[in-house]
Amino acid sequence: MLTPEQIESRLDKILLRVQKPGRYVGGELNSVQKDWDFIQTKVALVFPDIYDIGVSNVGLKILYDQVNQREDALAERAYAPWFDMEALMRAHGIPLYALESKRPLACFDLIGFSLPYETLYTNALNILDLAGIPARSIDRDETHPIIIAGGHSTMNPEPMYAFMDAFVIGEGEDVIHDIINAIQSFKIKRQDAGNAIFHLSSFDARMELLHTLAQIHGVYVPRFYEASYLQDGTVSHIEPTVQDIPRIVTKRLVAVMPPPPTKFIVPNIDIVHNRVSIEIMRGCTRGCRFCHAGMITRPVRERSVDEILLAAEEAIKNTGFEELALLSLSSSDYSNVLELVTRVGEKFGGTHLKVSLPSLRIESVSIDLMEKLRANRAGGFTLAPEAATERMRRIINKYISDEDIINTTREIYARGWTTIKLYFMIGHPSETLEDVQAIANLCKRVISEGRKVAGMKVKLNAGVSTFVPKSQTPFQWVSCDTPEKIRAKQALLRRELCDKNIKLSLTDAEDSFLEAWLSRGDRRLADVVYTAWKNGAKFDAWHEGRAYEKWIAAFEEHGLDPLFYTHRQRRTDEVFPWEHITAAVRKNFLFQDFRQSLEGQIRVDCRLNCFACGILPTFANMRRENPGDVWKCPDVKSPVSLNPSAMSSLKLLIVGD
């Protein structure tokens, strides 16, 4: 295995031959370098995309901070090299290394992947290969690190089950310490005194450690579970194959968010989000039926204004960044948003700091908030109506009137903003071409009304993505729209939105289908992922890496029909591939909510009325130990039970039929 000095020597010969050498050199301000020889547990945190994207990832920043606070552990980082760098690394025999120490990833005790979305899967396999680590868990032995993954996409971990030793289900701040402690205890148990190298003595020893990890709340070790299938290809059941592990793995939750990191790494190059990012609250109470993040991050927990301000001040001092992003799934729903924005203005007034609140809900953006944001040099306004007819907004449970949208955008333009971003989705359940035409009509009307108050300079950026049904949501039963219908809807929008002041952005339909295959896929897709990667698929979210035909060929090679995963009606009593994984939102609740969507019924903000989704009973002890209003939950109402026969007989609406 190469030493750090040997790796640096080889890097010197190739770095000037690649785009952006700064991606690969490390040494950034606020990066943490510890004395390797005196640290008990070494963790490599990996974001399987390029440095420019990964270094901004908030989840990885949190874990980097958490691990490096320990005196007995270190965390270093690695990202996916771009095509040019990978080719040179392979040609010169350079394994993938951690930026801080330049040590090969294979030297670490634990490698943790962040997998927020499915299109990173082939990159994860490529990174393991570049590190000289077998891609499949079953092929690893006592000389290899433990490989884990977490992130939103792992709420259905099954398409990646063959490659990860373990998955973290849910939030990572506490469980990362449990995992490190378990590894340390195991090392003490297995090693001779004075041997500081993590070296498992046998395959059985590795299995013993994985069995220990499987007993940690929120850790899923897939090799200890077995899936069976019915003749129609659907899942029959998923059961544990060993004792003392849970039949259903429930997500890990932190009762109170720990203090946010304040020593953000200052990158060597310009990146996507060069800013201080402070998470002001976690979770969402709105219950949008398509929203994966909103369902799996319940309940809402908020940080205090004082804690946010203190962290922001420290982070700006430590980095020199000139933008502050106040992050959440719906920042304008933060209970004290006006006070927060006011006090940010008071504290940083007169500086060059720009404040942004990404992800604002139209119905919670008040005129007062607009005024405060304008006074604080806020960035552009981004709003997400998601659909353009009131019928569709009722179906997705994002109900707001057209007039509210127009009035809000008019007020924004009137206060000096010249550009607004609106996000929509196409392909929602029961959507028609008339609903898509309404998106174009609404965009035109926003521009028209904006010109009345701000003149011809107003602009609109309309981002239109394609709906992908996700696990653990009310829409996990629905099928995707067909490729033909998606392309017809996109063509309609291109024809209609040709105003020079309207910028239309559309997602590639093929990218959406790749995401859809993997988001609700079963274990059989692991072979498809592996074959697609071996055939050259990687950077699947990038135009340069798009390899749709390689995925289709991989499906064919393994005798699987991609339409089975995307364009098939799910039975109401179907066992899902993720049935043994839960975000603590009950399946019955999700089905009831789905049934209400078919009837156009809406649910109000669950801070106003608890609908008994299952979160509070699951974490009752945690809530009891943390009283107060940190959790924004009302009293629980009696849960609604559904008759199984009624579930089986209900006719589902099939999108695309």
Give the predicted meaning of each segment.
Residues 450-451, 481-597, 604-629:
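C-terminal low-complexity, glycine/proline- and small-hydrophobic-enriched intrinsically disordered tails
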Residues 60, 92, 128, 162-167, ...:
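Short secondary-structure boundary/capping segments
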